[in-house]
């Protein structure tokens, strides 16, 4: 009799937990048809299980200035560089650092590329952006620390552990996407690159307004130090970049601080704002949102130019003689070209 009661309670517990899991999964944003940027971080874990394919030469970390401005497909086609972009919307520097830690659980790339715009933020910003980075990470100590470093005053750690606590009110906003992608998702990026082929020229770009203090904050700089130290410890070359986005404005005073830091620590720093002509960037044709980000044309131009820098200034090599990697990229490039054709067709 006692045994039957035990079985009954176990069955009830399993049924309850299963129901809560399904409900939580239903209520969580799917980031497939809308606000697709929220899907980028999680897609990394779906890379090939074959370690020879999974081992990327270059991993980008940072905000939208990496995942919208660089194309790993071009780096592979032109230079045989196997790369991935671990970018997310308004990714803060401490989030980038913990994503670097997370990446090193799976692989040790030769080069880490970090976009420096996020140095402007010294404190947590917005929950919506936090979630687009943090929710996609697999659970680890790095994720826990990233959540703790990122939460605004109104956020609670348990809401990240049990997302149903945060998303219970989405019940009235559910749509067909929530049901269609309940148990599976659809890839929205190409090795972390978010493709946009449409064109909106850069016109009347606002000038930067004077700031009371141009110094990067102590907290932000401490995470840049941690990133530099971790890369050095693991034998990884850290490359700092500033993407050629015209807005948000990049101040000369910020540029001076990054240049000084790179020189002090022996790091390669590339400011693409100063190299748009060399890269062939035309802001009347190569941006889809008036200069904030590159479109497909601009990203491919920038990637060709950066690929040359990577081959000359880092230890990356041409891996197009590796059969398993070539086979994987053949499939990736087919999907890339299909997406490319479809986007151009819709214009």
Identify what each model region corresponds to.
Residues 29-47:
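Alpha-helical transmembrane signal-anchor/signal-peptide segments
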Residues 52-70, 293-296:
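Catalytic nucleophile-elbow at a beta strand-turn-alpha helix junction centered on a G-D-S/GDSL motif
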Residues 111-123, 182-279:
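Conserved, well-ordered alpha-helix/loop/beta-strand core segments that scaffold catalytic motifs
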Residues 129-234, 320-347:
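Secreted/periplasmic serine-hydrolase-like ester/acetyl group-modifying domain
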Residues 61, 65-147:
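Membrane-embedded segments
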Residues 85-89, 212, 216, 291:
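Acidic/histidine-rich helix-loop elements
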Residues 253-328, 337-347:
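C-terminal regions of proteins
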Residues 8-28:
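Hydrophobic membrane-insertion alpha-helices, especially the h-region
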């Amino acid at each position: 009799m006692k045994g039957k009661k035990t079985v009954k309670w176990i069955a009830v517990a399993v049924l309850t937990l299963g129901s809560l899991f399904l409900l939580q999964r239903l209520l969580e944003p799917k980031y497939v048809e809308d606000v697709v940027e929220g899907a980028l971080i999680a897609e990394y874990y779906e890379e090939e299980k074959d370690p020879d394919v999974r081992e990327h030469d270059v991993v980008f970390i940072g905000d939208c200035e990496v995942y919208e401005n660089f194309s790993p497909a071009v780096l592979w086609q032109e230079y045989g560089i196997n790369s991935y972009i671990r970018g997310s919307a308004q990714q803060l520097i401490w989030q980038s650092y913990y994503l670097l830690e997370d990446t090193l659980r799976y692989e040790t790339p030769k080069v880490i590329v970090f976009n420096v715009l996020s140095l402007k933020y010294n404190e947590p910003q917005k929950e919506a952006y936090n979630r687009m980075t943090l929710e996609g990470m697999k659970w680890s100590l790095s994720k826990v620390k990233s959540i703790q470093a990122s939460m605004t005053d109104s956020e609670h750690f348990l809401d990240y552990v049990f997302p149903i606590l945060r998303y219970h009110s989405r019940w009235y906003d559910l749509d067909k996407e929530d049901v269609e992608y309940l148990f599976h998702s659809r890839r929205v990026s190409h090795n972390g690159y978010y493709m946009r082929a449409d064109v909106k020229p850069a016109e009347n770009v606002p000038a930067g307004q004077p700031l009371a203090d141009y110094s990067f904050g102590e907290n932000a700089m401490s995470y840049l130090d941690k990133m530099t130290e971790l890369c050095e410890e693991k034998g990884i070359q850290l490359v700092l970049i500033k993407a050629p986005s015209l807005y948000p404005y990049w101040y000369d005073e910020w540029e001076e601080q990054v240049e000084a830091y790179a020189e002090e620590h022996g790091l390669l720093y590339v400011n693409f704002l100063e190299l748009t002509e060399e890269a062939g960037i035309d802001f009347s044709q190569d941006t889809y949102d008036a200069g904030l980000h590159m479109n497909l044309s601009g990203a491919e131009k920038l990637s060709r130019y950066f690929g040359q820098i990577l081959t000359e200034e880092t230890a990356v090599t041409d891996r197009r003689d590796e059969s398993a990697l070539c086979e994987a990229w053949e499939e990736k490039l087919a999907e890339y070209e299909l997406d490319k054709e479809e986007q151009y067709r819709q214009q």
